[in-house]
Structure formats: structure tokens, C-alpha cells
């Protein structure tokens, strides 16, 4: 009994041709870790560089590992990162559906087709999945491999539980080409007859990938180098169906250090974690793009890229075989640069929730505080501790008033505060320029360095040795009344 080929011919007719088509195919099992984000980014860049199509496919066949809400995380992360997809579950496309659990019937049909063509067989052996996963399965001992097809189909029709396994050649070799690692040849005898369709009718990850990549017209498959060992079996599936093999791009892992891969289980950060730690999305993307890829040609020395620049510069030949080490200090360096180069209003908007963590008083201007911070913070999470003195003057050490460079000690500081207080009280122009001009003129009148006057005033108003901005900016933001109150507290603290 041969299969009716109408369905398969219709599926083949839907396959788009003529353009580069890439796919990001995550499983909704949690947050987007750095390696996954890099895969998504490289996949998007390959498509955009070639003027091709970027597809989002949700791989949810492993029902036991699914986490509620994880699909929303995928959509949100891609949107925040600007990795727009041309086809996918939410936008549709010519080869829908784009969720694997909705394609169950397709996998079953193609598994049956492969059985008919001799590339797979029904297996009725009661082997546990854990035994198969651990490599204990020995195809040489599997009596089902050589069952006549009519007999096997009769047992299926009788309701006997089964899986469908790939029939790997017992002899010879299989060679596949990877764009990064070149040609790799393996002995067929080292490959197992992997399960393609499980007892519950759902496909395994490896089988669903091959079917979907072909039917969606995927030209370039980007994934981690841990899948190199599975590539020969993918190739044999393509050959058994008579399909063209896509370009493989296996990327080396992102490492925590020279010995350990990054892993959520070991506390390594996901994209969401990095954002919570105060890193900006553009900085994360720029840094992740360079984790294992180097620009070439006229951009070879370039470090900082916009997304359009990355799309223009990206080429597969620049991807390294060597593992990339995730360096949080280097990411911090990138982030600081991005913060400094933001438009002031954009930085103020990004900084506001972090400013308001410690500055609850709405009278204090977010934009004015942000202006002090932009050149002085590396991450957004640096902000709360830097500006907490605006809401409440901390209980500071009198030793703060002593500064050799400014030529101040407790006695000099007391004198400066006592003398500047009436000047502050009399000042009508409480603007940055007004405060600045008054203090500079008064220091000249006193015959002291500017810093000799500014240092004790800043300490009295902020109660910190290190502040974003100097005395003038801090006094302006605090306002006249609060500045005078804090100067009086400083005089009292110094024994005046």
C-alpha cells in the first residue's frame, strides 16, 4: 500500500524560493539566555544582510519543559531588541502554522512517508526514553529494524504502541558541510537509529526541525555547536527525502570562563537579568554581536554599531570557531559608552525609574538630576545610590570636610559655610548661572581658591565625598530653602 502523494505535493508547492530565509526557533522554556539571544541576533542579521526573510517558529513539542508565559517573553524580547520577524505565529505567513504543536499531523505524515521510502521503521520495543537518551539503545539488537513493512503495519493497525526510528546505514560515512567548521565526516556505525516520532505521536526535536526547515524554505540554519553531532543524522534525513540541505552555521558556545559554558542553572544572566542589572538593550545587542563574530574590511576596527550598521557589516565568514568568553566588564564598558551618547531626554526617560527609587520628592527635577548622572554612571542601577542624598541628607563623617587639594579642614569649612550662608540667603537668582557667578565672585572676594569654598558647601548639601555634579548643580536642584537648611545643619555639625 503506497501513500497518496497529493498532500506532499501540495506542501512542496507552498515552499517559498529565491531569497535567503532564516528562522529563530526557540522553545518556550524560560527566559532568553545570552546564547539564545546571540542565535536570534545572528539569524536576523544574516536575513537582513541578504535582504531576506526572518521567521519566528515556536518549538513546543517537548511539552514537559514548557513554562507558562515563556512565549510572551520571546515576543517581548525580540520586540525590545528590534529583531522584527517577517513571518511567525503572530503575523502569519505562507507556510503557517509556525507553532510546532499545531503541525503534529504534518510530522506524522512525513514519518510515514519516510517509512515507506525505507529511511525509517516502526519500532515496538519497550525501551525507556531515558535509556535512549543515555545512548544505551543498540540498533544492532533491535529486531524491529528488519521487520517486513506489511507485518509492522499490521501490528500498528492492531493498536500496538510504537515509535518510528530513523534507519541509519550500518556502513559507510556521512559528510556534512558547516559554514564555520568546514567539512566533517563521521562513521555511520557511530550513529544511533534515533526516534523520529514518539509513542504519543509527537515528533522529536531533531525530526521536527528537519521537516519544518524544509517546508518553510529555510536556507540557513543557525544553532549552537552542541548540535554538530546531530548534523549527520539531519543530512541523512534530507537525503532520504531527496531534499536540498540548507547551509549550516554552528556557533561555538558562549562561556562564563575558559572551562564553563554560561548556564542559567549556575546563575549566569539572561537578557532579562542584564536589563534588571541596568544594562541598555542596544549595548547588550552590540556586545553580544561581537561574542564570536568580528567585522572585516573597512569596519574591522569598529566597536560600536547601530543595528543597521550590523546588518550591513555582518557576514558568516567573520564568525569564529573558538568559544567566546562573556566578560561583564566589557559589557559595562559598552553600556557606559551608550549611556554617554544617548540624547539627554532619552537618558532621562531611561533613568527616571532608577532615580525615583531613592528620590521620592517630586519637587526635584528628574531631567536636572539625569543631566548630572549621564556622564557619571556606567549602568542604570548605579543611579539610586548616587542620588539618595537629595531626599535625605545622610549622617556623614566630619572628616569629609578635610580635603588637602581644596585646602580645607573642619575649621576652614566652618568659616566658609558661615560666610557663604548670608550670600545664599540674599541670592534672588536661584539658577545654575546665578549660583555659580555668586560663588565664584565670593571666593575671589575672600581671596580663596574656588574649591576652598565649593568643597565644604557640597559636603554640607550632599553629605557624600563623591557626588554626581558639584556644589552649584546640587544647590540648584535642592532649591534655596533646602540648601540653606543643609548649610545651617553643616555649621551646627561643625560646632558653629
Residue ranges and their predicted role:
Residues 48-62, 207-220, 241-255, 468-473, ...:
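Glycine-rich phosphate/pyrophosphate-binding loops
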Residues 2-134, 230-243, 283:
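N-terminal Rossmann-like or analogous alpha/beta NTP/dinucleotide-binding catalytic cores
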Residues 22-29, 55-60, 216-221, 269, ...:
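Glycine- and acidic
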Residues 433-494:
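Charged substrate- and nucleic-acid-binding regions of tRNA-handling and nucleotidyl-transfer enzymes
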Residues 1-31, 49-54, 154, 161, ...:
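Non-catalytic terminal extensions that flank enzyme cores
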Residues 43, 74, 114, 118, ...:
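Residue-level signal for inorganic ion chemistry
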Residues 344-446:
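Small-residue-rich helix-loop
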Residues 113-116, 120-250, 256-262, 270, ...:
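Active-site cores that bind ATP or allylic diphosphates and position pyrophosphate for catalysis
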Amino acid at each position: 500500500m503506497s501513500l497518496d502523494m497529493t498532500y506532499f505535493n501540495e506542501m512542496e508547492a507552498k515552499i517559498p524560493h529565491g531569497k535567503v530565509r532564516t528562522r529563530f526557533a526557540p522553545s518556550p522554556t524560560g527566559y532568553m539566555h545570552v546564547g539564545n539571544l546571540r542565535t536570534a541576533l545572528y539569524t536576523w542579521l544574516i536575513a537582513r544582510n541578504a535582504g531576506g526573510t526572518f521567521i519566528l517558529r515556536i518549538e513546543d513539542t517537548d511539552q514537559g519543559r514548557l513554562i507558562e508565559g515563556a512565549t510572551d517573553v520571546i515576543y517581548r524580547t525580540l520586540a525590545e531588541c528590534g529583531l522584527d520577524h517577517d513571518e511567525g505565529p503572530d503575523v502569519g505567513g505562507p507556510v503557517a502554522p509556525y507553532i510546532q504543536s499545531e503541525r503534529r499531523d504534518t510530522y506524522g505524515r512525513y514519518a510515514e512517508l519516510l517509512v515507506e521510502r525505507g529511511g525509517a521503521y516502526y519500532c515496538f520495543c519497550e525501551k525507556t526514553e531515558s535509556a535512549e537518551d543515555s545512548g544505551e539503545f543498540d540498533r544492532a539488537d533491535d529486531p524491529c529494524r528488519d521487520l517486513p513493512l506489511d507485518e509492522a503495519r499490521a501490528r500498528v493497525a492492531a493498536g500496538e504502541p510504537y515509535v518510528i526510528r530513523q534507519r541509519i546505514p550500518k556502513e559507510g560515512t556521512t559528510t556534512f558541510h558547516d559554514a564555520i567548521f568546514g567539512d566533517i565526516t563521521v562513521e555511520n556505525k557511530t550513529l544511533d537509529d534515533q526516534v523520529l516520532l514518539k509513542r504519543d505521536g509527537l515528533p522529536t526535536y531533531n525530526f521536527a526541525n528537519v521537516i519544518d526547515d524544509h517546508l518553510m524554505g529555510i536556507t540557513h540554519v543557525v544553532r549552537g555547536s552542541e548540535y554538530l553531532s546531530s548534523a549527520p543524522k539531519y543530512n541523512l534525513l534530507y537525503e532520504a527525502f531527496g531534499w536540498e540541505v540548507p547551509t549550516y552555521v554552528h556557533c561555538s558556545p558562549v562561556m562564563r570562563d575558559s572551562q564553563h559554558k554560561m548556564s542559567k542553572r549556575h546563575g549566569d544572566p539572561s537578557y532579562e537579568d542584564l536589563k534588571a542589572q541596568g544594562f541598555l538593550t542596544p549595548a547588550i545587542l552590540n556586545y553580544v554581536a561581537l561574542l564570536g563574530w568580528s567585522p572585516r574590511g573597512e569596519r574591522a576596527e569598529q566597536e560600536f554599531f547601530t543595528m543597521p550598521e550590523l546588518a550591513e557589516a555582518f557576514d558568516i565568514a567573520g564568525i569564529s570557531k573558538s568559544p567566546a568568553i562573556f566578560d561583564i566588564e566589557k559589557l559595562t564598558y559598552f553600556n557606559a559608552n551608550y549611556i554617554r551618547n544617548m540624547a539627554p531626554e532619552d537618558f532621562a526617560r531611561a533613568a527616571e525609574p532608577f532615580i525615583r527609587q531613592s528620590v521620592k520628592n517630586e519637587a526635584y527635577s528628574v531631567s536636572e538630576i539625569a543631566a548630572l548622572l549621564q556622564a557619571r554612571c556606567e549602568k542604570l542601577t548605579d543611579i539610586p545610590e548616587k542620588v539618595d542624598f537629595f531626599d535625605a541628607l545622610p549622617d556623614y563623617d566630619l572628616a569629609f570636610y578635610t580635603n588637602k587639594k581644596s585646602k580645607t579642614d573642619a575649621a576652614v569649612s566652618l568659616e566658609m559655610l558661615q560666610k557663604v550662608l548670608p550670600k545664599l540667603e540674599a541670592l534672588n537668582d536661584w539658577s545654575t548661572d546665578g549660583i555659580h557667578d555668586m560663588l565664584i565672585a565670593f571666593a575671589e572676594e575672600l581671596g580663596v581658591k574656588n574649591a576652598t569654598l565649593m568643597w565644604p558647601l557640597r559636603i554640607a548639601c550632599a553629605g557624600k565625598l563623591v557626588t554626581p555634579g558639584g556644589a552649584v548643580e546640587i544647590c540648584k536642584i535642592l532649591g534655596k530653602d533646602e540648601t540653606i537648611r543643609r548649610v545651617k545643619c553643616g555649621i551646627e555639625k561643625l560646632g558653629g
